[in-house]
């Protein structure tokens, strides 16, 4: 996995979220496993290269570290 591309994908997701009133769904494909939908809606998240993980900082102060092997990140506009 290319850390630079993942960082760019996370930055794109954050910008895409802002442009669409934070109505996005982030779809994370895990290595040789099922696909999960993780709605990091309105939460601050970033890619940590050293951990190879997504760090999600929830608005209530809790933190989630997604350490699954990430193959790709796709952003979809959520239908309201």
Question: What would you call each of these model-derived segments?
Answer:
Residues 1-63, 69-80:
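Eukaryotic intrinsically disordered, low-complexity regulatory linkers and tails enriched in Ser/Thr/Pro
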């Amino acid at each position: 996995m290319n850390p630079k591309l993942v960082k760019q994908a996370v930055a794109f997701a954050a910008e895409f979220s802002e442009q669409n009133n934070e109505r996005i769904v982030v779809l994370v494909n895990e290595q040789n496993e099922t696909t999960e939908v993780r709605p990091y809606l309105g939460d601050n998240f970033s890619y940590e290269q050293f951990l190879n993980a997504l760090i999600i900082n929830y608005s209530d102060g809790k933190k989630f570290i997604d350490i699954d092997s990430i193959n790709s990140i796709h952003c979809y506009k959520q239908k309201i």
